[in-house]
Structures are given as structure tokens and as C-alpha cells.
Amino acid sequence: MSLIPQEIIRRKRDGLSLAPQEIAAFIEALSKDGISEGQAAAFAMAVFFRGMNRDEMVALTLAMRDSGDVLSWRDIGRPVADKHSTGGVGDNVSLMLAPIVAACGLAVPMISGRGLGHTGGTLDKLEAIPGYDVMPDEALFRRTVQSVGCAIIGQTGDLAPADKRLYAIRDVTATVDSIPLITASILSKKLAAGLETLVLDVKVGNGAFMQSLEDARILARALVDVANGAGLPTTALITDMNQPLCDAAGNAVEIVNCLEFLAGGKAGTRLEKVVLSFAAEMLVQARKAATLEEGEALASAALSSGRAMEIFARMVSVLGGPSDFIENPSRYLACAPIILPVPAARSGWLASCATRDLGMVVVELGGGRTKPSDTINPAVGISDILPLGVRVEKGEPIAVVHAASSEDAERAVKRIEDCFGIADNAPEIAASVLERIT
């Protein structure tokens, strides 16, 4: 169809539904620089205020998928699956989940992102491993998935380039938090990766982008409905982010946590519950398990047998990391020069955590970004974070700061003390997995 961008913008501005061919033409022009930044910004703002129905969101997602390459894994011989998280603090689930389900017979070509603001990024964590290539060429990406079972890499310029352009414009026009635009951005990249099934981790709480359960439900429902409408079988779990998920926040410190988890050292934790819940969902979707209970048992066996650890080690090695990384992580991971415990301000029960603020402490230490061009220090962060609901005595460490200087460490200790609330009575703690959306 002939494209008149301002007519499409006007129709959406006036609250009218756009036809799939209108959306496809607009996005195709956007990806080929046939749409000005002003027109793209106006379109994003019109969608922000007027919204989109399901059919429009499906059309937008498919158009953004088709703006670049779409990978095919027909020759892989395994079900192709992935998981996406909306982001939080201490969320290193992908690092363990990919090798666990790969050990159970799935192929996981995981396209991940970097951290921005208070949330950590999977790619930043992996880059704490010297030599690990988060941007391999397609041949190495395919070879890794084929030979290892999983590969965690970054988005290349050839996958959903329209999303990259539109996101950059949304970022500077206050249109990031639009459900239709979030949905299309997430799913276009996943569809371009050639997945057969997808699970979504929609986080809710004071450390998540979605602060209320109702908002999380709206986003989860939109993602599941649009993904299924686009031909990608998808389920979502809404998970709690009112405290860090793992006991570390940072980059090298979360890799250490990952290795401890894969070695069986995090049994019974909230992190284990979330990881195994997502593994079970993926295995049921791929018909490797008949029930979620069977899927969880298969995932637990992959973990306890050491097969998941072995696959993680192979992934690191094939993608350029040290071949003996698992045996000698301390030889390769950067260590901060200043390590300082955070004492409990008083005796009582850890009752609350300002999780977003805790994530910002990591950024202030140098372990995160406030703008995409910022450089990260992989060594800094927070470790040994106690979970909510435990009893502490005054002066007992509730976390440990890893900093580049004494001044940074002392400032972080004070900030972390302020992040935690200590009560006289044991608090009620939310479950780690709150709801399942299908």
C-alpha cells in the first residue's frame, strides 16, 4: 500500500484502529529510514495515549519481527525455547535456566539485554567472564546452540532493527511504559529468534517496572495473548520482586551465585523455586514433560547430576571464555579491592527491602548504567544479601559491599542500611511465584 505516515498517525491519534497493512507499511518505512524521528515519536505518543487492540498489537509485533532477519532452527533436532524477564534486582535466572533445560533436551537460543537503571543485565553479567563473546556472528551462535544446547548472546543489528530504532525514540519521548509498545518490543525480538515456545517472567513489586499486581497482570495478559496470536505458544509467571531474587546484585558476584546454584548450593531458596518453575513450564510446553511436577523433577535431576553445570561450562568455553572457568572461577573473575559488611542497624526481623534503591546502590558503585554509553566495573556489587523473614542481631552482617574505593564502600553501606526495614515481629513474606497466566 502507498504510505502517508501522517494519515496513520492521525488515525491512531483519533483513537481509530489501524489495519495490519497500515502498521506493516509504517514499520517497514521506519526500518528503512523512510519515517522521520518526529513522525516515529508522534506515532509512539499516539499509541501511548490511545492504546492498541489485540489485532493491532499482533500486527505491530509481526511487522517489527519482519523488519530484519528471522532465524530458523529447523535442522536443530530439538524443541526451540526461550524465556524473557521484565527485569529486576539479583535476577540471574537465565544463567542457570538455559543450561538446565538444555540438559533436558531443549535448544535455547537466548537473546538477552544489558542493564539500565536499577535492573541488572544478563549480558553484563556474562561479560564479567573474560573472553565470553556476547555478540558472536550467526555461525558461532548456531554452532553453540547445536553443539551445547544453549547460547546466551545479545541482539544483533539484523534482528528486529525496527525495534531498535523505535525503542531509541521511545526512550527520549517518555513513551517507554506503553503496554502495546512494550509487548511488541519484547515479542518481535523473540519471534525473530525463531522460537517454538516462550515463557515470560513478569516481575511485580518495588524492584520491578510493574509496581502493582494489577499492572503486572495487564502486561502478562497482553504478552501472552499477542504471542499466541502471533503463533508463538507462550505462558507467563508473575513473580515477586519486593526483594532481590538471588543473594547478590552486580555482575561478577551474580556469576559466583550462578556457579554456587549449579553446584547445588542454593537448594530451598526463592531463587531455586523460580528457576525450577520456569524450567518446568518450558519442558511441558516442549512436550518433554507431561505435567509441571514431572518437569520440575527433570530439571532438578539435571541440576543435581551436574549436567547443567557441564553445559554452562561448555557454553562459556565455546563462546570464548576460559575452558577451566568452572574449576577456577576466582582466577578469572574480577575482585573488588574493598569488601565491607553491612551491619544490621538493630536486632529484629528483616521485614522489608527498598529493592529499587538497592539496585541503584549497585549502579552508584559502578556496576550498572544510568545511560547506555556508561562503562561497567564487573567487580563491584553486593553479595551475601539476607532474605526477608530472617532474624538478625544488631551488628550482624545483612549484606556485603564490593567496592572500588573505601569512600564508595562506606557510602554504599549507609545506603544499604537504609534499604532494609527491621521489625520486632516476623513478617509475612510473599511467595516467589504469584500467578500463572496462560
Swiss-Prot record:
GO cellular component: cytosol
Source taxon at top rank: Bacteria
Record's keyword terms, sorted: Glycosyltransferase, Transferase
Catalytic activity field: thymidine + phosphate = 2-deoxy-alpha-D-ribose 1-phosphate + thymine
GO biological process: pyrimidine nucleobase metabolic process; thymidine metabolic process
GO molecular function, one term: 1,4-alpha-oligoglucan phosphorylase activity
A Pfam family that the UniProt record links to this protein: PYNP_C
Enzyme Commission number: 2.4.2.4
Pathway in which this enzyme or protein is active: Pyrimidine metabolism; dTMP biosynthesis via salvage pathway; dTMP from thymine: step 1/2
PANTHER family given in the database record: THYMIDINE PHOSPHORYLASE
Quaternary data: Homodimer.
Protein family per UniProt: Belongs to the thymidine/pyrimidine-nucleoside phosphorylase family.
Annotated protein name in UniProt: Thymidine phosphorylase
Organism of origin: Agrobacterium fabrum (strain C58 / ATCC 33970) (Agrobacterium tumefaciens (strain C58))
